[in-house]
């Protein structure tokens, strides 16, 4: 890990909310397959499709554009790792610097796939860089991130830093996403139109 890579990562982290405000608003994926994860097997012995049998997904050159890519782990029924929180679903930030951000989280075994803002970050939460995220960030810059499950959290360690820089965990029916110094609360969407009417009413009240 070089000092230059660390500084680059920190600058990108600090400027992330500004970039978020400048880009087009996120739109939720269309299709029930995004909102209804595969039913998982009762135990490892009953697994029909393991997470390791599915090729690692990567961000396409230039990002995936406006149409959400198909779920990566569709059909994978390997039970979640014992220490893993169940973060599966489509989530939208309702409070925090990244309000409006939408992301889809898939899980099976130790594997986690987070799709959002044009990127696909596919990882195995075993604490290694080799099986972590080796891809690009929303700006196109290269990233290398180790992932681990700790005390009900998904912790991410860019360049295998000692402390987690990004964390996701459940808080009741909501998810908390800490991105560096920024804390966001997310609500799970049940359909593409979930929350749209509420937002329209809020906009009308603000006029």
Predicted regions and their residues:
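A mature extracytoplasmic/lumenal domain signature
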Residues: 95, 116-118, 160, 181, ...
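Short, surface-exposed beta-strand-loop junctions and turns on beta-sheet-rich folds
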Residues: 119-122, 161-164, 183-185
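N-terminal glycine/threonine-rich, aromatic-flanked beta-hairpin/loop signature
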Residues: 52, 97-142
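Short, surface-exposed secondary-structure junctions/capping segments
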Residues: 135-150, 199-207
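Acidic, glycine-rich flexible loop segments
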Residues: 143-166, 170
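Short, exposed beta-strand-loop hairpins at the edges of beta-sheets
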Residues: 174-181
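Amphipathic/hydrophobic helical signal segments and adjacent flexible N-terminal regions
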Residues: 3-104, 109-111, 191-207
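Short beta-strand-to-coil "C-cap" segments at the C-terminal boundary of structured domains/repeats
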Residues: 169-171, 186-195
């Amino acid at each position: 890990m070089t000092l230059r890579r660390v500084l680059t990562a920190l600058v990108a982290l600090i400027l992330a909310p500004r970039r978020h405000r400048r880009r087009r608003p996120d739109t939720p994926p269309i299709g029930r397959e995004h909102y209804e994860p595969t039913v998982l097997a009762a135990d490892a012995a009953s697994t029909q499709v393991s997470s390791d049998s599915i090729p690692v997904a990567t961000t396409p050159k230039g990002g995936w554009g406006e149409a959400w890519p198909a779920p990566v782990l569709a059909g994978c029924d390997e039970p979640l790792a014992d220490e893993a929180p169940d973060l599966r679903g489509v989530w939208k930030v309702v409070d925090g610097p990244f309000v409006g951000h939408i992301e889809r989280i898939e899980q099976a075994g130790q594997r986690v796939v987070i799709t959002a803002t044009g990127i696909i970050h596919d990882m195995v939460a075993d604490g290694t860089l080799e099986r972590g995220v080796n891809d690009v960030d929303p700006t196109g810059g290269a990233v290398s991130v180790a992932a681990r499950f700790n005390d009900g959290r998904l912790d991410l360690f860019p360049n295998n830093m000692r402390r987690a820089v990004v964390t996701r965990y459940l808080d009741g029916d909501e998810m908390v996403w800490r991105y560096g110094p920024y804390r966001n609360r997310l609500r799970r969407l049940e359909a593409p139109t979930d929350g749209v009417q509420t937002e329209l009413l809020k906009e009308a009240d603000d006029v």
